[in-house]
Amino acid sequence: MAALGEGAYGKVTVIRTGDKKYALKETILPEFPEELEAVMASVREQDMNLIHPHVIERHWCRFSDNKFQICMELGKPVYKADERRILHDIGQALHFMHSKGFIHRDVKPQNIVQVGKLYKLIDFGLTRKGTCSTVLTGYMVSRWFRPPELLEAKGDRAYDGRVDMYSLALTAYFLQRQKPLFSGETPVLLKMYKKYKARGLYKHLVCDYEDRFTSKELLQHCSIAPIEGSEGELPYRTGNVAKFASMLRGGYDLDAKKIGYKGIYNEL
């Protein structure tokens, strides 16, 4: 078996059955019974509900010693991709999940793979159903891809699938340019969010939780050309998605002047 990745709580390897290859994810089971039941409840719900062309296909799951194993289709890691294709494919996956009541809570480049011509969402270990509380969330979403409400996390605040949408935007930017839009420690990020909120950039970055696109709104305003036999432009329809897309394309109309990402960092 060839190793694909390894972390503190498990690993992913490539296995072969007949002439086909699959990815086998092994997770070390939690020590306490109440945590184990939460894991099992999550797995049962996902297996019943999360079947979609842009969600990685799971073939079987089982217990083995102190590990929980999931066998799924094998995809290729994504290191560079057209941001519009990521918005379209993973946006569809998130819309499907959100319509079923699930929040992924860990959208980032490492959790997207390519299977054939499709991009697919993987790793549902942090997925939960219904709204969640910031008190219980902690560092669920990786820092570079975390929305402001989880960076601040003041008090007990409920959140829904819109946290995934902010993470999706930053993920798409990263995969297009191989660098994060916002890097650094949490206090630096919060300083930038607060500095630009009053100047209008906050809205263009869709940081305001109430004003942010839902996955449904993104797909309603976003049109991607068919991929068969064409590698040309992937056009957006006109509409509010232009504001969303402008954040990803490298410039903003801010106080009647053009300001790029480098300019943002220079002014901090």
Task: Locate the predicted segments by residue.
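Activation segment signature within eukaryotic-like protein kinase domains
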Residues: I86-L87
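C-terminal lobe of the eukaryotic/viral protein kinase catalytic domain
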Residues: K179-E210
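Short beta-strand micro-motifs within the conserved protein kinase catalytic domain, predominantly
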Residues: E57-N66
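Conserved short submotifs of the Hanks-type protein kinase catalytic core
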Residues: D65-V78
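Activation segment/activation loop of eukaryotic-type protein kinase catalytic domains
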Residues: V115-R143
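Conserved end of the kinase activation segment
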Residues: E149-R162
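Regulatory extensions flanking the kinase catalytic core
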Residues: F213-D253
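Catalytic-loop of the protein kinase fold
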Residues: H98-Q114
